[in-house]
Swiss-Prot record:
<feature type="binding site">
    <location>
        <position position="71"/>
    </location>
    <ligand>
        <name>Fe(3+)</name>
    </ligand>
</feature>
<dbReference type="InterPro" id="IPR011059">
    <property type="entry name" value="Metal-dep_hydrolase_composite"/>
</dbReference>
<feature type="binding site">
    <location>
        <position position="302"/>
    </location>
    <ligand>
        <name>Zn(2+)</name>
    </ligand>
</feature>
<feature type="binding site">
    <location>
        <position position="69"/>
    </location>
    <ligand>
        <name>Zn(2+)</name>
    </ligand>
</feature>
<feature type="binding site">
    <location>
        <position position="229"/>
    </location>
    <ligand>
        <name>4-imidazolone-5-propanoate</name>
    </ligand>
</feature>
<feature type="binding site">
    <location>
        <position position="307"/>
    </location>
    <ligand>
        <name>4-imidazolone-5-propanoate</name>
    </ligand>
</feature>
<dbReference type="Pfam" id="PF01979">
    <property type="entry name" value="Amidohydro_1"/>
</dbReference>
<feature type="binding site">
    <location>
        <position position="136"/>
    </location>
    <ligand>
        <name>N-formimidoyl-L-glutamate</name>
    </ligand>
</feature>
<dbReference type="InterPro" id="IPR006680">
    <property type="entry name" value="Amidohydro-rel"/>
</dbReference>
<keyword id="KW-0408">Iron</keyword>
<keyword id="KW-0963">Cytoplasm</keyword>
<keyword id="KW-0378">Hydrolase</keyword>
<keyword id="KW-0369">Histidine metabolism</keyword>
<dbReference type="InterPro" id="IPR005920">
    <property type="entry name" value="HutI"/>
</dbReference>
<comment type="similarity">
    <text>Belongs to the metallo-dependent hydrolases superfamily. HutI family.</text>
</comment>
<comment type="function">
    <text>Catalyzes the hydrolytic cleavage of the carbon-nitrogen bond in imidazolone-5-propanoate to yield N-formimidoyl-L-glutamate. It is the third step in the universal histidine degradation pathway.</text>
</comment>
<feature type="binding site">
    <location>
        <position position="136"/>
    </location>
    <ligand>
        <name>4-imidazolone-5-propanoate</name>
    </ligand>
</feature>
Amino acid sequence: MSSLLLDNIGELVTNTAAGEGPLGIHRDAAVLVEDGVVAWVGPNGSAPAADRRIDAESAAVLPGFVDSHAHLVFAGDRAVEFAARMAGQPYTGGGIRTTVGATRAATDDELRATAHRLHAEALRQGTTTIEIKSGYGLTVVDEARSLRIAAEVSSETTFLGAHLVPAEYADRPDDYVDLVCGPMLAAAAPYARWVDVFCERGAFDADHTRAILTRGQAAGLGTRLHANQLGPGPGVQLGVELGVASVDHCTHLTDADVDALAGADGATVATLLPGAEFSTRSPYPDARRLLDAGVTVALATDCNPGSSYTSSVPFCIALAVREMRMSPSEAVWAATAGGAAALRRTDVGRLAPGSQADLMILDAPSHLHLAYRPGIPLIRQVLHNGVPQCRP
């Protein structure tokens, strides 16, 4: 058994009931890690001996970020589309087809290089658990290979064959849904933990969404959903009805949508993706409204080449505080424990005996600095499964 002691922690965020406030903060604390798992959390003066030691030098220590919504397997970029949008052209989601064409044309090694590069980029910024979706292949072969590559990077992989109806099926959406529910799902399921649908105007309607999620669930996959990004729609309430783990975007919500999420009592998380609103110059979700209603909220990057090309959870925390009326503590919780809830994980997003030893040391005395000092590389060191990773 190998052990590691992280001591002289000025502020330790645990996300447990044992500490101070909703973040479970401990002051002047230490953490003992044994074989990649947290074995003990307590006062610095009572810290047990260990094989190795890391001195936090009075800095803040947090659980690793849990990014529960990302798209890392793709080819090309859409910088020109971004520039055009900033010049006043509205985003309608059609640009996804540009990435589909590039992804289909790319080699496995090219897709693999992008996925690994973005994963490493996220890790340097404190993300130790990341969900990765397919959705830029939209053929049986390309969706399966996208998920196979994603599975090399993360155990949290999501089949998103229902990202958009591809051009070759534009006049036959029902036929494409049959393909997604049949051969595509069969090819993708061995590499996926989740199934997702983009339930939105111009993509998939409620009937198609229900059919795909129901079939995916029957194949043993958990369910998640993109909904209510571009406008009001049936997605949020349908997601709650079907018991999906997370409804993502939630930008345009009715009172009935909020009531449905609140009534789910945490079983369906509202995952907010402020990077998408930043990059599309769109209205931000009203996180305050959701939190005040008792909805469980997660924050994620939506890292993708079209509408949110960022892998930085700290950037999304700053946006959430500045633009979505979240407190810094609420935003940090949403990016750690909230993300874990969106993935139905209890072993990450918190620091307590038995949890995975995924954590970060900040170059700051408090978690507040993540929102207070936007754009500054505050992650001093990241540990994943108790193993120090490359420094930023």
